[in-house]
């Protein structure tokens, strides 16, 4: 892997605000990952698109205050900054509605993302949500195509129904070197790809290695930690259980925290096994405070 750029990580995808009845929080998995990495001291870039509106201004203000580069941020003169409407039932359980036709659906490639051309960060991170629209999907896949072989391509599958299909999943798996999914997403991948004939998880993982040539697969399991699958050790996973603190306040953003710490430790030269343990511990600590980004304000 060759690094010939001033930054270590590129994340490309959505910026959204979670809009609650009485408050709002900035988010989107790509932004959350870059936020954490920037606070860890890793030079990072986010490629996304926001609206020319109040939420867009809030995003710029927060990013500047946290030292997050705005080099890859585009502003759309017509489409609004991404929003997720959050509805709470009588018990306070949230229901999320991701609004359609948002600025992040229209991320443009060259010349807007010229800083990517000829540069090879250590890691390039992406997911599936921002690929729901053909404009952003084309930009994401073309960008990853330029980086493939020089940067580690990290797919955090982040399935958000109904915003994915067979083509998006298959193309994304073909592009990635590293896959991260949770248990529910793994079952959904099995269904979407028509792999129901595989009786067990290990056989399914083995199929991903052979079909997509993925180098490492991380399956997160909530309070039970995470498993690391490696092709040379397949089909048996390397298990990393964890004991979460009894002081859990909020699990929102735990997956993004895991990913951020995992990438951070891999950049530091840690083995995937050690990086996984440290990532689990970091995610569990994030769950002890409210919000996906504890120091957002």
For each predicted feature, which ranges?
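Hydrophobic anchor at the start of a short beta-strand
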Residues: 44, 70, 151-153, 217
């Amino acid at each position: 892997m060759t690094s010939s750029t001033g930054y270590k990580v590129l994340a490309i995808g959505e910026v959204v605000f979670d809009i609650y009845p009485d408050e709002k929080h900035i988010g989107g998995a790509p932004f959350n990952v870059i936020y954490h990495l920037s606070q860890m001291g890793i030079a990072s870039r986010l490629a996304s698109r926001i609206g020319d509106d109040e939420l867009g201004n809030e995003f710029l203000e927060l990013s500047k205050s946290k030292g997050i580069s705005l080099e890859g941020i585009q502003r759309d003169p017509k489409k609004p900054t991404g929003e997720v409407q959050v509805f709470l039932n009588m018990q306070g359980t949230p229901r999320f509605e991701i609004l359609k036709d948002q600025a992040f659906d229209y991320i443009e490639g060259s010349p807007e993302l010229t800083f990517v051309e000829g540069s090879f960060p250590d890691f390039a991170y992406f997911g599936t949500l921002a690929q729901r629209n053909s404009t952003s999907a084309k930009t994401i896949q073309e960008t990853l195509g330029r980086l493939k072989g020089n940067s580690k391509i990290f797919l955090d599958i982040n399935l958000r129904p109904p915003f994915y299909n067979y083509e998006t999943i298959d193309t994304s798996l073909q592009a990635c070197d590293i896959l991260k999914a949770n248990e529910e997403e793994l079952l959904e991948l099995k269904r979407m790809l028509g792999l129901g004939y595989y009786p067990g998880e290990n056989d399914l993982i083995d199929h991903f290695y052979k079909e997509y040539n993925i180098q490492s697969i991380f399956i997160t399991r909530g309070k039970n930690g995470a498993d690391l699958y490696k092709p040379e050790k397949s089909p048996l996973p390397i298990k990393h259980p964890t004991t979460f603190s009894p002081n859990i306040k909020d699990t929102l953003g735990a997956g993004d925290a895991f990913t951020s710490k995992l990438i951070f430790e891999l950049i530091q030269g840690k083995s995937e096994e050690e990086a996984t343990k440290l990532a689990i511990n970091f995610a569990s600590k994030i769950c002890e405070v409210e919000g996906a980004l504890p120091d957002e304000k």
